[in-house]
Amino acid sequence: MLNKIYYSFSMVAFVLSAVVAFYALRFGDVFTQEGIQLLFLDLTGAGVTLMGLLNVNSKHSLFTIVVASLVLLVVFYQMNASHIMMADSLSSIQDSVFWKESFVWSSRLVLMMMAWSLIQSLCVPIFFLVHRFFGTKKTNDPLI
C-alpha cells in the first residue's frame, strides 16, 4: 500500500516538475539548459515509476522496490540540483506568480520525495530481514 502511495506521489512530482520545465523553456540562459535536463529527468523518473507500479505485487517486488527507490533517489537528487541552479536566476525574473509558486511547490515535493526514496531504500530491506528471521515460524507439530 505504501509503495503505491510512494509511486503515486512520485508521478505527481514528475508531472509538476514537467510543468516547471516546460515553463522554464520559455526563458533563455540557464532556464533552457535546466529545463531540458528536468524534462529528461521527468521522463526517466516517470518510466521507473511506471515500472514500479506495474511490478509492485510481483514475486520480485522487494528487489524492484529497492532498485526503483535507489534510481528515483538519484533522479530526485539531480532534479533538486536543477532547481537550485534555476533558483539562482529566479530572482531576476519579474513574471507571473504561478511560475514562482509552482517552482516552490515542485522544489518542496522533490525534496520530500528524495527523503522518502532514501528512507524506502534503507527501511524496506531491513523490514524484510527482520520479518524473515524473527517472524512467526510455522511448525508441523499437530499437538500445538
Regions found by a protein language model. Name each.
Residues M1-L2, R132-I144:
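Short, charged juxtamembrane terminal tails flanking transmembrane helices
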Residues S61-H83:
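Hydrophobic alpha-helical membrane-insertion segments
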Residues A13-A21, G45-T49, V71-V75, S117-V124:
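Helical transmembrane-bundle signal
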Residues R26-L39, F76-M112:
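Interfacial non-cytosolic loop connecting adjacent transmembrane helices
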Residues S10-V15, S91-G135:
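Alpha-helical membrane-associated segments of multi-pass integral membrane proteins
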Residues M1-G47:
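N-terminal signal-anchor transmembrane alpha-helix
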Residues A18-G28, L50-V56, F76-M86, P125-F128, ...:
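Transmembrane helix-loop junctions and nearby membrane-interface residues
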Residues L41-T64:
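Canonical alpha-helical transmembrane segments
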